[in-house]
Structures are given as C-alpha cells and as structure tokens.
Amino acid sequence: MKEFTDLDLYYMNSGEHTTLYEKMGAHMVKERNKILGTHFRVYAPNAREVFVIGDFNAWQRSHQMQWEIDGVFQLYVEGLKSLENYKYLIITHDGREIYKADPYAFFSQVRPETASTTYNSRYKFKDQAWMNERVEYDFKEQPVSIYELHLGSWKQKFVNRNEGGAPMEAFNSYKDITPLLIEHLKENNYTHVELLPITEHPLDASWGYQVTGYYSPTSRFGKPDELKYLVDQLHQAGIGVILD
C-alpha cells in the first residue's frame, strides 16, 4: 500500500489533494491478481484510538489501527477480501465510542444498513474509441443535447410484496437500465446523459443530494462494476455521461 507522506498531508489540509481516494479508505492488497488482504486508512485527528470492526471480527475491538502521521491511522488486515462489511470505531479522549462509516468507501451496504463494504473492482473498460473521439469534440461547433434523469424513478418497475399482495416500487439495476436507456437516448438523438446523484445516500424518495459516501456508487442499483458497465456501454454507443 502507498505510504501517506508529509506532502499528502499538506495537500489534504489545504484542500488541494486530487487523488486522496488512492491512499485513504479500504484497498485490496494483491500479488499476481490474488487478494492477500485489505489495507485501511482513515483521518481521525481527535481520536485516542481507532479500530476496524466488521463481520470479519464479530464487530469487536480486535483490530486496532496504528497512528501513522498527524491524525492519520492505518491498518493492514491479512486475508480480508472483497464484500466484507466494516466500520471504524473511534474512541475519543473522554472515552466516548463513535461508530463511523468510511468516508472513502468504494461500496456500502444497502439502506437502511449503514456499514461500508470492501470492494475489489475487476471491470475493464472497452470505450477507448469514444475516449479518443472526445478529445477531438468541439463543444462550440458541434451539437450537444443532454438528457437529465434520476435513475431511481426512471422506468420504475413494480413487484409484489408477497403472493397476492399489493405491488411495491422496485429499482432497476444498473444493468437493467443500460439497454433501455441507450435505446431511448439514441431514438431521441441525445448526445449526453446527466445522471442525478448516484453516490450513496439514505433516502429512496430523495434525488440523492444528501450524500453519505462520495466515492461509493449507491448500492440500491447494484455493485460499482455494474455502474462502470453502464458508463462503458453508453460510451460505446456514442453517448457521453455527466455525473451530477
């Protein structure tokens, strides 16, 4: 795992660190594509102690993080792989216990649960042709038509709570939406789609602006690699993607 340096600390404190997610949060440690464990790092400058707790240790204080540099704590957990639920247990100097989801988590539990989830992305994009064309695209001279949508309410489907029960709303997954969205956009000659917030948020009824995880695509529609599939397929269809 990459070391957290004085330079990282300087740019983090000044608000200028543009790749902080590469060093903070939970990262798989691999050797020849085999996951050996997970490295955790979190910034908790006012903590006395910090623990990583989760399903893997029965949510107990068996994995204490080490102070690394000026309020940054880190820990490597051997053998911990993808899709493990976890939180940080922060002990304050006056003895209070505070349970926190990871602000740099790449995946989260489905609401109403609130834990973060380790995640190993394996997706390989195949949109290089579109990416190359984007460099040459002149927005001042070529048409731009943007379709804005909220994934949670677009093309809603309904399922029964139980046999003979009243129908209830259900979400399409990222993969379910992909062919439907591409067809709609192409039929109506849109060049781009703008997705209302798809980062993790607590309320199904909201548009997603109450963000609880800026690096975590909401799990109500599926896994992060399934979102990557959606973006990849849109690009391959010649459609740009804007994230609100």
Tell me the role of every PLM-derived stretch.
Residues 224-243:
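C-terminal EAL-domain catalytic cores of bacterial cyclic di-GMP phosphodiesterases
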Residues 54, 153, 197:
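Residues that line or immediately flank small-molecule/substrate-binding pockets and catalytic motifs
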Residues 50-52, 86:
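Short beta-strand elements bearing conserved aromatic residues within extracellular beta-rich modules
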Residues 156-172, 183-228:
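Aromatic-lined carbohydrate-binding/catalytic grooves of carbohydrate-active enzymes
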